[in-house]
């Protein structure tokens, strides 16, 4: 879910590198129709979803005759992630749009590679309660969460008192405070270290990304 975003593209790179380990069953994108079409033709999933209905016809026409089923809307994603042939769901959608389908994946006892931190910000208590009564397992794959997870493997949590979350330094880190009153959106989108989507780049510049994490 979120195949055309940064983490989605990286996930597909891994799937392409290890075809003996991974079969792509479903691709979900919001509005990036051209890239979704390209991904679908390359990986040949059973289903693709373009959440934005205005792009449905373009995707459907491009994939006509391929045997790939094309859907639109958000509700269908919850149905598709729960299908029996799916064993792992990568949730890399931006914002809260991944919440309903993550809940559906938990109910269906899927393994979940979670990059969508907003899901836990909004509904962490609900998600954690559901995990207790499900065979579903949640793996953090967003950068800091994944690093914390790997650092804690084999550790006794009783011996861990603090985790320190660092920041790589956005475009305003060394800027004089008085300059901040006149910065523009374009300034905020010029991250010095990473090429990311617009929303996460803005969130990084404002430090909101760290607050969510």
Residue ranges and their predicted role:
Residues 1-48:
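N-terminal Rossmann-like dinucleotide-binding module
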Residues 6-11, 34-35, 96-103, 114-115, ...:
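Short glycine/serine/threonine-rich phosphate/pyrophosphate-binding segments
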Residues 59-62, 95-108, 115-137:
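Rossmann-fold NAD(P)-binding glycine/threonine-rich loop
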Residues 72-104:
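Beta-loop-alpha module in the N-terminal Rossmann-like domain of NAD(P)-dependent dehydrogenases
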């Amino acid at each position: 879910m979120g195949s055309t975003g940064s983490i989605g593209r990286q996930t597909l790179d891994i799937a392409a590198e290890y075809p003996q380990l991974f079969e792509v069953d479903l691709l979900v994108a919001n509005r990036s129709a051209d890239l979704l079409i390209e991904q679908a033709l390359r990986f040949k999933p059973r289903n693709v979803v373009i959440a934005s209905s205005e792009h449905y016809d373009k995707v459907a026409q491009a994939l006509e005759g391929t045997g790939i089923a094309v859907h639109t809307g958000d509700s269908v994603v919850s149905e598709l992630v729960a299908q029996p042939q799916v064993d792992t769901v990568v949730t890399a959608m931006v914002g809260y749009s991944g919440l309903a389908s993550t809940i559906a994946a938990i109910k269906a006892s899927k393994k979940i590679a979670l990059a969508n931190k907003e899901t836990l910000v909004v509904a962490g208590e609900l998600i954690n309660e559901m995990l207790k009564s499900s065979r579903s397992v949640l793996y953090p794959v967003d950068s800091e969460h994944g690093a914390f997870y790997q650092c804690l493997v084999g550790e006794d949590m009783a011996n861990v008192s603090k985790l320190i979350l660092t920041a790589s330094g956005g475009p305003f880190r060394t800027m004089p405070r008085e300059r901040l009153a006149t910065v523009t959106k374009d300034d905020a989108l010029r991250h010095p270290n990473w090429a990311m989507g617009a929303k996460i780049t803005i969130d990084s510049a404002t430090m909101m990304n760290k607050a969510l994490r």
